[in-house]
Every structure is written in structure tokens, then in C-alpha cells.
Amino acid sequence: DVYKRQRCASICGGWVALKLATNTLKKSGQIKFDPITRHVAAISCGIVNGEQKLDLNYQEDSAAETDANFVMDDKGELIEIQCSAEKKPFSKEEFEIMFSMASEGIKKIVEIQKSALDE
């Protein structure tokens, strides 16, 4: 649903906003070191009509047999996973494909975050 997409976008954009704020605080001398040690990003994925898809839009999410959200850091470590069988159970293999897709998607999002921050 729209909430899930907004949630993933909020995590990605919120992390950038927090990083910009800590950069400003560090430059002004209000903090001595940057407490943020890793990038954090989130992405949705799911199984729609038997096919694994990344970053589901509203129509895909509404039709999904399985729906998942992954939150990871730039080292590929997991922060949160939410995965539900919406219409039918899914296999471990299907989950692993979604996990792999989400990992690759998050790598791309982290690159966009770095670009936005001129890192």
C-alpha cells in the first residue's frame, strides 16, 4: 500500500536529513564527531503474479501474493525485515530471491544518498 512505500521513502530521506544535520553540527563545532557510522536505507519488494518485483507501486502492492520491506545498512547488515504472505505462503527460495533483490536495491539507494551528500 501507499503507507509502505512512504515508510521506505521516509527511512531513506530521513537518514539523509539526519546526516545533513549532523554534518552542520560538526562543521559549526557543536559536536566533535559524527555519531552516524553507517548509511541506512529501505526498500519494498514482493511476489506479484508469481514474479518477484522490487519497489512495488500501488497496483503491484495491492495484487501482491507476498509483500516485504527490508531495512539495511551500507554494509548489507539487516536492521528490519517485514514479510507477509498476503494471499498464499511463499518458499524459502522465494524469500532468498526477494532478500537478494532488496540488497541490490539498497546498494543503489545508498549510492544515491552518497551522491546527494557529495560523498
Please provide the spans of the model-predicted regions.
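Short, small-residue-biased leader/transition segments that mark boundaries at the very start
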Residues: 2-3
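A structural signal for small-residue-enriched, beta-sheet-centric alpha/beta enzyme cores
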Residues: 8-9, 18-23, 30-119
